[in-house]
Amino acid sequence: MHHATPLITTIVGGLVLAFILGMLANKLRISPLVGYLLAGVLAGPFTPGFVADTKLAPELAELGVILLMFGVGLHFSLKDLMAVKAIAIPGAIAQIAVATLLGMALSAVLGWSLMTGIVFGLCLSTASTVVLLRALEERQLIDSQRGQIAIGWLIVEDLVMVLTLVLLPAVAGMMEQGDVGFATLAVDMGITIGKVIAFIAIMMLVGRRLVPWIMARSAATGSRELFTLSVLALALGVAFGAVELFDVSFALGAFFAGMVLNESELSHRAAHDTLPLRDAFAVLFFVSVGMLFDPLILIQQPLAVLATLAIILFGKSLAAFFLVRLFGHSQRTALTIAASLAQIGEFAFILAGLGMALNLLPQAGQNLVLAGAILSIMLNPVLFALLEKYLAKTETLEEQTLEEAIEEEKQIPVDICNHALLVGYGRVGSLLGEKLLASDIPLVVIETSRTRVDELRERGVRAVLGNAANEEIMQLAHLECAKWLILTIPNGYEAGEIVASARAKNPDIEIIARAHYDDEVAYITERGANQVVMGEREIARTMLELLETPPAGEVVTG
């Protein structure tokens, strides 16, 4: 189908189909990701009806990857990255090796050459950035120990894939034609590693000062549009520069841009302002993956598809599980990492495309990679759901490591009661929290920012890291015997869900919440809040009171 405006058609068609099928998936109690992928299949060239631009869609999806990784970087400090390097580096490399060997074994069964097997195996070895991060975000695990290990593991995988993409042409020439010597290969590898190190060094030394400075200057203008624009310009600009100047992936470039901004107080505002765009383009990523999938392969090569899927779901996951256990982490952590990595994504598509261009991977190989990606991404939410049920039935506190036990079970003294439970410690929450502390009211803070939680704990303030929508987090904060629940988070509808859950757990608790609009006030009140404060209304009321109060020292005549 010819489109006069392919960009607009692709965005509108992709988002509309994703919305419809995402809603249907949600209605059927399955992950919306499945709906987004099916939307891509319907919009792709292999099914009748509407066909989106298959060249534009992946580029739009890459924007989602950039913004998503930038957001992750905003919550991921260099200290966090260094804390997991001992397991992330050897673990990721070993897991890539296992997956590659399994892929080579399958390719040998299919009658492909050694080099084809290596490329095919590498395609099956690296997880999707978007899928992994979405899974962690949905379960509020980004800031947990498990989340930090998974993200560190992902970063190492991305670095290995960057090296692979640069070295593959030289290796292919050496193995297939014999005209590339080891010295040339070593030089290429040295240059690539040098570029990666140079990029990281520049971001740590120069970007660490320059990026926060630019953000501070844009914030000082008082223009929200300029601030949001500066966030997007930095995220996209650094990611693009990383690719063009250093041959580093878009995802890694954006990640380090976010990480150097992490130390700035503006990082949370930046994360909040880019959230809608991140979500929209992340959806387009899943749609673009679905567009590449030809459903006929499920009929033409069912056994090969099942074998490919088995390598992704079980081969690499079991390798990751045993490696994490080998490093002394709990079963919970090992299973979470294994489930997170039980899928493939962006780099698999890029590597498969390069393999096709170099005549190293047949069309059948690329089709198997795409089938494995689609099916593994669809099944990933199911794996996590099964994992959570299994852990709920079998895991005990004794099975966790001491470190995890402290983080997840002993954040709050067991004897605290009749306290104020404050959800959110941003601009509003911090002002309120300081007043409560000054009044000697027992206080527990629930906050999603690890940095803020660490700062509060250093001051001796009880703080729980996590999302208040999670019942386990509320249990840690002792909701059942709290006297007040105060919600200062800006999302009124999320606050309403928290209110309903809290009211069911503690019918007598006094609940005060924040809202921005009249419909949010009504919604939160219906869910069980005692009082809802709308910021704009309170500002107007206070200003009116000031107008009615005569200034000090001035005589009012009437």
From Swiss-Prot:
It comes from the Bacteria. Residues 25-31, 77-85, 134-148, 207-225, 269-279, 325-336, 389-558 are cytoplasmic. InterPro entries: Cation/H_exchanger_TM (IPR006153), K/H_exchanger (IPR004771), Na+/solute_symporter_sf (IPR038770), NAD(P)-bd_dom_sf (IPR036291), RCK_N (IPR003148). GO terms for biological process: potassium ion transport; proton transmembrane transport. Its main location: membrane. AMP binds at residues 427-428, 447-448, 467-468, 494, 514. Residues 1-3, 53-55, 107-112, 170-185, 247, 301-303, 358-367 are periplasmic. One of its GO terms (cellular component) is plasma membrane. Pfam families: Na_H_Exchanger, TrkA_N. One of its GO terms (molecular function) is monoatomic cation transmembrane transporter activity. Keywords: Antiport, Cell inner membrane, Cell membrane, Ion transport, Membrane, Nucleotide-binding, Transmembrane, Transmembrane helix, Transport. It is a multi-pass membrane protein. The chain crosses the membrane at residues 4-24, 32-52, 56-76, 86-106, 113-133, 149-169, 186-206, 226-246, 248-268, 280-300, 304-324, 337-357, 368-388. It is found in: Cell inner membrane. Belongs to the monovalent cation:proton antiporter 2 (CPA2) transporter (TC 2.A.37) family. This is Putative cation/proton antiporter YbaL. It comes from Escherichia coli (strain K12).
